[in-house]
Amino acid sequence: MTCCNQQSSQPKTTTTCAGGETSCYKKTWSDHRGSRTERGCGCPHVKPGIKLTCCKTDECNN
């Protein structure tokens, strides 16, 4: 599985997930700096107020 792992509006970068991971995630939230985005492997639990999208195809979290 290959997932995108760039932060916010940075140029696209990818990572190969370890351990047989089969999903990617994209988290979005707002803070004092504005809208923030985090991408990576897996499908983590998030705090209330954070939007989480998980998917199961290569680079699906761009």
Swiss-Prot record:
GO terms for cellular component: extracellular region. GO terms for molecular function: acetylcholine receptor inhibitor activity; toxin activity. Pfam families: Toxin_cobra-type. Its main location: secreted. Expressed by the venom gland. The keyword Oxidoreductase does not apply. Disulfide bonds join 3-24, 17-41, 43-54, 55-60. It is found in: Secreted. Signal peptide: none annotated. CDD domains: TFP_snake_toxin (cd00206). Keywords: Acetylcholine receptor inhibiting toxin, Disulfide bond, Neurotoxin, Postsynaptic neurotoxin, Secreted, Toxin. The keyword NAD does not apply. Belongs to the three-finger toxin family. Short-chain subfamily. Type I alpha-neurotoxin sub-subfamily. Bird-specific neurotoxin (tested on chicken) that acts as pseudo-irreversible antagonists at the nicotinic acetylcholine receptor (nAChR) of the skeletal neuromuscular junction. Has no significant effect on the electrically-induced twitches of the rat isolated phrenic nerve-diaphragm preparation. This is Alpha-elapitoxin-Pc1.
